[in-house]
Swiss-Prot record:
Biased composition (Low complexity): 272-292, 590-599, 688-703, 711-725
Biased composition (Polar residues): 614-633, 726-741
Family designation: Belongs to the adn1/SEU family.
InterPro entries in the record: LIM-bd/SEUSS
Disruption phenotype: Ectopic and precocious expression of AGAMOUS, leading to partial homeotic transformation of the external floral organs.
A Gene Ontology molecular function term of the record: DNA binding
Known tissue expression: Expressed in root, leaves, seedlings, vegetative and reproductive shoot apical meristems, seeds, floral meristems and all floral organs.
Domain notes for this protein: Contains a dimerization domain which shares similarity with the LIM-binding domain of animal transcription coregulators.
Protein name as it appears in the record: Transcriptional corepressor SEUSS
Lineage of the species this protein comes from: Eukaryota, Viridiplantae, Streptophyta, Embryophyta, Tracheophyta
Gene giving rise to this polypeptide: SEU
Organism field: Arabidopsis thaliana
Length: 877
């Protein structure tokens, strides 16, 4: 709106008759301030809808000086021509009646007198025509040369919000002829307008016209709005030129054209208003269509970020919802844990006395904090953590607290944040119990500050019971004790015995209540609830089946079908991978070769039995006198005897049962059978009785076959042996340990496999040593030598079967010789020594194996390690 300060006074003029203006008097015309030629004023409506309008001609002052304005000019209809400067888009806003041809009160910038009481004199038609012609000529010139400059000035003036500083419009002397021409055209138009009848406006139109007067120009917000304004002004200029060039059209047609123009202006103004609202939407659409969204920037690491994230984790866990729903825990795990995260609890430092049922196997679990072997612990993956959190708080846990020492935080090469606490205390709060665990905590965060690994290695834990639970029980127990003491002191007759009995019962009941209050059935030996441990056990089962589950998802098959097609794993330990088809075919070939070798060995054994009969006949003479003495062997020789002379007639089945019994119950009693200075431990050698089937010494090919498999072949021709004093088979003697090893392997396959490897190594070394010494009989079992004869015995690779070597200094064993003190006949053809005389072999059941002392010490250390592994196994678990 136009400011309301008083206008500058306008200079004197001449009176204009009302007949020229087509008016009959009316309300006084309100005064207006001076406006430049480039800015149109806001319209003002009076009582009679009178309006003031400033024309766009630069030389208006000459015209206004020759015209007089009456105080009241309702609906004045003076048509003004446009000047050379551009018209404002608001110049046609706010007309009343025939407002397209309505003239306004013209105020000259040069005038300084008062408007009221002054009138302009009449001008002649020639002067008006000259004025119009001059304006028309100037219009064409100024439109060509100053269009862009005038638009810029107008926009700056509108945006500035004021009209200050606008200079007056000067009249040039060369424009007189143009003014006369314009005056003639204007006079003709005035005559035509006087002939028009009065136009009656409807109330709706009047209201619309009043609303149009209040349209405000919005500031420019974009280049598109500026372009629309320029286009609007060009259209207005063209329309004004059309009005001047079409004087012969009917007033009705002119009114229709004017209404169309007004509608177009309103639409353009609405577009201009909507442009600021559309502007913020355009960059979003452009970004969605052309530019991809940038990924969120990773947070730059700063010291202390890991500890701060841990604080947020504990705070969020404490402020869980009351209903403890699973959806909250799923969101919690997704927010604070990585998709492949693991949470581990190590209890390796507790010792073997604690109950560790359901934890990981000892050979699989490994803790990088304590590095204890064997280790024990629990592990849960990110898929199980939501359910684990829910069960923990459902099983009685009210709150879980974490107390930590000074952190040690660092960032590794992969961008992960490692947070370590050398001292950490985790406390689980129950209703009547507190479980406090001391240990070390290590947390690994991913670059986006999500927990990748959580490891808590507990050293110990304490179960704390509140005093308020124990004080009543202790008080009751003390009062019962006092009553019992008083009753016992006052008991002088038999009538006091019932009272003593009642007090005693009360004392016992109070003690039981106290013991019950001290018990903590809520948690196990490790300080975890039963439901919590059960969930961890299920988690371990699921983790072990994860490969099968992934295989089922990849092949899109059902569980049963996937289990049938899933590659099986064979072997004593489940950790070993399954055999390939090529390995299976190789095993079949080896089995076939083994069967062929067994047949050949049976034939060789039959031949050797015949040769052995001659040896057994020579040894019968001295057998009865020395059998008992040699069965009860001297422990200083290092020979382990698991039986006495009375057990010589027992069968192999009873000995095998004894082996199993000793292996299961006597793991810790090996020291009773083994002397302290013996470098070997393990099972005692169980020998075959004379009544059992015996075989001859196998050939080297049979030994090679039986060493890796550690199994003794059975022979159907053994029953044909007529002699009861035949030498037992080496393989049969050596196989006495295999039933115990197989049954022990059922309990712990990994331990048995390690012992088998050591024994196989012993047998292979024996075979190599015996082959280098010329080939002699081989026996399996514990072995050792006397100090007197050890030097001579080690000089050959002979194993003494069925007896013990005499403590003779002249004992000499040769490939073709015999013992000293007797005549030995050599059987060089078969490599078997015929032993006669006082030093002949006894009918004992111990085979002595000759080895190098250094090799014996190494093998002894290996056997001791294997036995210690058996002893450390928790058989009660």
């Amino acid at each position: 709106m136009v400011p309301s300060e008083p206008p500058n006074p306008v200079g004197g003029g001449e009176n204009v008759p009302p007949s020229i203006l087509g008016g009959q008097g009316g309300a006084p015309l309100p005064s207006q301030p001076a406006f430049p030629s480039l800015v149109s004023p806001r319209t003002q409506f009076g009582n009679n809808m009178s309006m003031s309008m400033l024309g766009n001609a630069p030389n208006i002052s000459s015209l206004l000086n020759n015209q007089s304005f009456v105080n009241g000019i309702p609906g004045s209809m003076i048509s003004m021509d446009t000047s050379g400067a551009e018209s404002d888009p608001m110049s046609n806003v706010g007309f009343s009646g025939l407002s397209s041809f309505n003239a306004s009160s013209m105020v000259s910038p040069r005038s300084s007198g008062q408007v009221q009481g002054q009138q302009f004199s009449n001008v002649s038609a020639n002067q008006l025509l000259a004025e119009q012609q001059r304006n028309k000529k100037m219009e064409t010139q100024s439109f060509q040369h100053g269009q862009q400059q005038s638009m810029q000035q107008q926009f700056s003036t509108v945006r500035g919000g004021g009209l200050a500083g606008v200079g007056p419009v000067k009249m040039e002397p060369g424009q007189v002829s143009n003014d006369q021409q314009h005056g003639q055209v204007q006079q003709q138009q005035q005559k035509m307008l006087r002939n028009l009848g009065s136009v009656k406006l409807e109330p709706q139109q009047i209201q619309a016209m009043r609303n149009l007067a209040q349209v405000k120009m919005e500031p420019q917000h974009s280049e598109q709005s500026l372009f629309l304004q320029q286009q609007q002004r060009q259209q207005q200029q063209q329309q004004q030129q059309q009005f001047l060039q079409m004087p012969g059209q009917s007033p009705q047609a002119q009114m229709n054209i004017f209404q169309q123009q007004r509608l177009m202006q309103l639409q353009q103004q609405q577009l201009l208003k909507s442009m600021p609202q559309q502007r913020p939407q355009l960059p979003q659409q452009f970004q969605q269509q052309n530019l991809p969204l940038r990924p969120p920037l990773k947070p730059v690491y700063e010291p202390g970020m890991g500890a701060q994230r841990l604080t947020q984790y504990m705070y969020r866990q404490q402020h869980r919802p009351e209903d403890n729903n699973i959806e909250f825990w799923r969101k919690f795990v997704a927010e604070y844990f990585a998709p492949n995260a693991k949470k581990r609890w190590c209890v390796s430092m507790y010792g073997s006395g604690r109950q560790t049922t359901g934890v990981f196997p000892q050979d699989v679990w490994h803790c990088e904090i304590c590095n204890r072997k064997p280790g024990r612990g629990f592990e849960a993956t990110a898929e199980v953590l939501p359910r684990l959190f829910k069960i923990k708080y459902e099983s009685g846990t009210l709150e879980e607290l974490l107390y930590v020492d000074m952190p040690r935080e660092s960032q590794n090469s992969s961008g992960q944040i490692v947070l370590e606490y050398a001292k950490a205390t985790q406390e689980s709060v129950f209703e009547h119990l507190r479980v406090v665990r001391d240990g070390q905590l290590r947390i690994v965060f991913s670059p986006d500050l999500k927990i990748f690994s959580w490891e808590f290695c507990a050293r110990r834990h304490e179960e704390l019971i509140p005093r308020r639970l124990l004080i009543p029980q202790v008080s009751q127990l003390g009062s019962a004790a006092q009553k019992y003491q008083q009753a016992a002191q006052n008991a002088t007759t038999d009538s006091a015995l019932p009272e003593l009995q009642n007090n005693c019962n009360m004392f016992v009941a109070s003690a039981r209540q106290l013991a019950k209050a001290l018990e903590v059935p809520l948690v196990n030996d490790l300080g975890y609830t039963k439901r919590y441990v059960r969930c961890l056990q299920i988690s371990e089962v699921v983790n072990s089946m994860k490969d099968l589950i992934d295989y089922s998802r990849e092949t899109r098959t059902g569980p049963i079908e996937s289990l049938a097609k899933f590659p099986r794993r064979t072997g004593p330990s489940s950790a070993l991978p399954g055999p390939s088809p090529q390995q299976a075919s190789d095993q079949l070939r080896q089995q076939q070769q083994q069967q062929q070798q067994q047949q050949q060995q049976q034939q060789q054994q039959q031949q050797q039995q015949q040769q052995q009969q001659t040896v057994s006949q020579n040894t019968n003479s001295d057998q009865s006198s020395r059998q008992v003495a040699l069965m009860q062997g001297n422990p200083s020789n290092g020979v382990n005897y698991a039986f006495n002379a009375a057990s010589a007639s027992t069968s192999t089945s009873s000995i095998a049962g004894l082996i199993h019994q000793n292996s299961m119950k006597g793991r810790h009693q090996n020291a009773a059978y083994n002397p302290p200075n013996s470098p070997y431990g393990g099972n005692s050698v169980q020998m075959q009785s004379p009544s059992s089937s015996g075989t001859m010494v196998p050939s080297s090919s049979q030994q090679q076959h039986n060493l890796p498999t550690f199994q003794s072949p059975t022979s159907s021709s053994n029953n044909n042996n007529p002699s009861q004093n035949g030498i037992p088979s080496v393989n049969h003697m050596g196989s006495t340990n295999s039933p115990a090893m197989q049954q022990a392997g059922e309990v712990d396959g990994n331990e048995s496999s390690s012992v088998q490897k050591i024994l196989n190594e012993i047998l292979m070394n024996n075979q190599a040593h015996n082959n280098s010494s010329g080939g002699s009989m081989v026996g399996h079992g514990s072995f050792g030598n006397d100090g007197k004869g050890q030097a001579n015995v080690n000089s050959s690779g002979v194993l003494l079967m069925n007896g013990q070597v005499n403590n003779n200094n002249n004992t000499n064993i040769g490939g073709a010789g015999g013992f000293g003190g007797g005549i030995g006949q050599s059987m060089a053809a078969n490599g078997i020594n015929n032993i006669n005389g006082n030093n002949s072999l006894m009918n004992g059941r111990v085979g002595m194996m000759v080895r190098d002392p250094n090799g014996q010490q190494d093998l002894g250390n290996q056997l001791l390690g294997a036995v210690n592994g058996f002893n450390n196994f928790d058989w009660n678990a």
